[in-house]
């Protein structure tokens, strides 16, 4: 495997993103990187990929260049490897939010919700409760089509089609969360962090976010208490608990996830259609990925 894939995000107040955008894009292009970087007043969200020397140089740049005034000096990155470049081009975009919730009162850059690390969460799930004896509820904050690729055992899944639906479904299902320890989770941490802050703000108690999301959990403890793989918003489509790309692909036409067995169907035509959207099939078309949900569009 020769390509290094980096993912990172941070909620932090940023005032100079218009000035940063062309400079960051130029540095990434000089290094030969591809991917997506989102900049918003509330922070940064990125997925980039390239050779080791290029990704190392980018990490040094974002952490230490005076341009960023130390805001990313300790920015943590999640790393995985792939045989090829998963992105087609390099994009640096300005957004209102780095992950869209459409709740302007939420200010995650002003303080985080409590977080639980992977090893502590595994211990809670092993014993069936947290350290205070409360039952632990895993709350999936991702879109329904992502959940279908894999999720934690017995996780709550409200079948949302986009993250901006999250506040409404939580309000409608508060009874599911009362008296329990809630651990929100997502792919890399960004959605579950914002989700946990929202739940705290509306008065739900004992809420945690999974530090680093599913990918960090895989890195630290593997696939314990998790079934399936983890959808990612790039051309790898899904990663297994060893953080290796799976045989799943994304349908060119409808963006549905097509697992290996479905690729054997005569209704699957690479570059044209899959069993979910084949014109001769009466099935339901696959759900599309929400633009901006993760930094390949983006984390």
From Swiss-Prot:
Segments forming domain Rhodanese: 132-226
InterPro entries cross-referenced by the UniProt entry: Rhodanese-like_dom, Rhodanese-like_dom_sf, TrhO, TRHO_N
GO molecular function, one term: oxidoreductase activity, acting on paired donors, with incorporation or reduction of molecular oxygen
EC number: 1.14.-.-
Active site: 186 (cysteine persulfide intermediate)
Any GO BP: tRNA modification
Pfam families documented for this protein: Rhodanese (PF00581), UPF0176_N (PF17773)
Coiled coil, from the record: none
SMART domains: RHOD (SM00450)
Reaction equations catalysed: uridine(34) in tRNA + AH2 + O2 = 5-hydroxyuridine(34) in tRNA + A + H2O
Record flagged with keyword tRNA processing: yes
Keywords, ordered alphabetically: Oxidoreductase, tRNA processing
Stated family: Belongs to the TrhO family.
Function summary: Catalyzes oxygen-dependent 5-hydroxyuridine (ho5U) modification at position 34 in tRNAs.
HAMAP family: TrhO
Identification of the protein by name: tRNA uridine(34) hydroxylase
Species this protein is from: Burkholderia pseudomallei (strain 1106a)
Gene this protein is translated from: trhO
